[in-house]
């Protein structure tokens, strides 16, 4: 049996627009894009604390490369376990910009943000333990970027370059 969600994305966007009118944009009735990433932490706090939203579960954070736009994005997937609704928020930044960490609001953001930095180079301000999580500290670059050149060797060991399944 499929349960009807208590709040749909249009309702969620109206709540966000009432406080952050110039900072969010509804895209194709599927996700909300935060256009003013400087307001992200305040928006995230509202998502968690607003009685009509109550997003208590950060399911995952994914990062992506915008390609020719020279932007890098983060997609946050939230769930309200008590109100049974879901939301995806996306934020895009350039290489010189950073996003506020939300690890103080959702502990699960800690490692997800570190992975987004390690693989895609997205920086998170005020992260309590901002360092690489998968690659060595001296690894050069961020391997999931479309413009990344895989090195021939790392510390004298050959680095495999078989991209058959993902290029």
Task: List each model region and its residues.
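Terminal low-complexity/charged segments
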Residues: 1-167
């Amino acid at each position: 049996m499929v349960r009807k969600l208590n709040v749909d994305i249009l309702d969620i966007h109206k709540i966000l627009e009432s406080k952050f009118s110039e900072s969010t944009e509804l895209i194709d009735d599927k996700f909300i894009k935060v256009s003013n990433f400087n307001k992200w932490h305040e928006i995230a706090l509202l998502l968690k604390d607003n009685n009509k939203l109550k997003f208590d579960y950060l399911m995952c954070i994914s990062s992506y490369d915008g390609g020719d736009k020279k932007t890098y994005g983060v997609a946050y997937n939230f769930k309200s376990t008590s109100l049974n609704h879901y939301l995806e928020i996306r934020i895009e930044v350039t290489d010189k910009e950073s996003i506020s960490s939300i690890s103080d609001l959702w502990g699960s953001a800690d490692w997800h943000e570190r992975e987004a930095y390690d693989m895609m180079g997205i920086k998170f301000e005020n992260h309590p333990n901002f360092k690489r999580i998968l690659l060595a500290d001296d690894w050069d670059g961020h391997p999931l970027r479309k413009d990344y050149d895989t090195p021939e060797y790392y510390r004298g060991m050959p680095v495999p370059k078989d991209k058959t399944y993902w290029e």
